[in-house]
A protein has these predicted regions:
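Catalytic, metal-anchored helix/loop core of enzyme active sites in primary metabolism
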Residues: 7, 11, 36-39, 48, ...
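Gly-rich Lys/Arg/Thr-decorated short loops/hinges at beta-loop-alpha junctions or inter-strand turns
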Residues: 9-17, 77-87, 198, 239
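Short, glycine-rich nucleotide/cofactor-binding loops
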Residues: 17-26, 115-122
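A short, well-structured juxtamembrane/interface segment
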Residues: 23-38
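Glycine-rich phosphate-binding loops that contact phosphosugars or nucleotide phosphates
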Residues: 45-194
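Short, amphipathic alpha-helical interaction segments embedded in low-complexity terminal/linker regions
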Residues: 185, 190-296
Length: 296
């Protein structure tokens, strides 16, 4: 095969992944809805994985802080072998049930434990999910095998059957891509339902550098239609926090009142704006949850 034929083959196989993921979406939606309720009650999300699965979990958890300003410790990735295994393969650690149990020792009843294993039988993940079941945590399994050995340990089975890999057994390929898509969809839908977006905008993002500070201004302009100068003035009054500035501009109220409304409604912009505008009839429950609404 020519090099072009090789990469075309890989790409053709990758194109099948989205369809495999689609089969797991009903289970994923149920997981998100139940996870939202648990997180509102003080629960945390814990990912457990080894090898590629663990690395993907670490990536997803790490990205939530800058994207949605999720406090550290709210979404936690447990990678078999720890930090050193992120850059140097440590394949043997995935075989330890006890290591998985140890990693899961901090789980509480209101938490959510999500195991990731392409094979559906990784002992490290099995140990973690066993502890999760013992304490009453919500459990889910992300895998490539619909008949996964660990399926009985999960309240929600997210099985994306991606089929044989281009390189037999190399689950970092299609199976890994499917896991990444499911993680993206889970964490993003979770943040939407928790009110950390407004329309399709990242209104809870953490602006930690020049690029992101510029993005905050543009997001505020896009959401409100104000000029660059007005947006910057509003952000200055809100100490750079996007949500209070947004409610201030959209509701025509002072920044402190905007902060108070947001605090009263768990940071959900739609609910804060609804109270600022007074009682309304026919407001959708999805708006109260901070779900996607038409762009403004």
């Amino acid at each position: 095969m020519s090099t072009l034929q090789v990469v075309q083959l890989i790409n053709d196989q990758d194109a099948q992944v989205a369809g495999a993921v689609a089969a797991a979406l009903p289970q994923l939606a149920g997981l998100v809805d139940e996870a939202v309720q648990r997180m509102r009650a003080g629960g945390r999300v814990h990912y457990f994985g080894a090898g590629t699965s663990g690395r993907l979990a670490v990536i997803d958890a790490a990205e939530l802080l800058p994207t949605f300003n999720v406090p550290p410790g709210l979404v936690i990735a447990h990678h078999a072998g720890g930090a050193s295994a992120l850059i140097t393969a440590a394949e043997n650690v995935e075989d330890s049930v006890e290591l998985g149990r140890s990693e899961a020792s901090a789980l509480r009843e209101q938490d959510i434990a999500i195991g990731l294993t392409a094979s559906g039988r990784t002992p490290f993940v099995g140990g973690a999910l066993a502890v999760a079941r013992e304490v009453g945590a919500l459990t889910a399994l992300i895998t490539s095998h619909p008949q996964a050995e660990l399926a009985s340990s999960a309240d929600y089975l997210l099985a994306a059957d991606t089929g044989p890999e281009v390189i037999t057994g190399s689950t970092r390929m299609k199976a890994g891509t499917a896991q990444k898509l499911l993680l993206n969809a889970f964490s993003t839908a979770l943040m939407i339902k928790l009110g950390r977006t407004w329309s399709n905008l990242m209104v809870d993002m953490l602006a930690t550098n020049a690029k992101l500070r510029g993005r905050v201004v543009r997001i505020l302009q896009q959401a409100t239609g104000v000029s660059d100068e007005v947006a910057r003035d509003a952000l200055a009054m809100s100490d750079g926090e996007l949500k209070p500035a947004l409610v201030h501009l959209l509701a025509g109220i002072d920044v402190q009142t905007a902060r108070d409304l947001l605090a009263r409604h768990d940071g959900v912009v739609a609910a804060a704006l609804a109270e600022a505008a007074g009682p309304r009839t026919g407001r959708r429950s999805s708006d109260r949850a901070g779900g996607p609404v038409p762009a403004r």
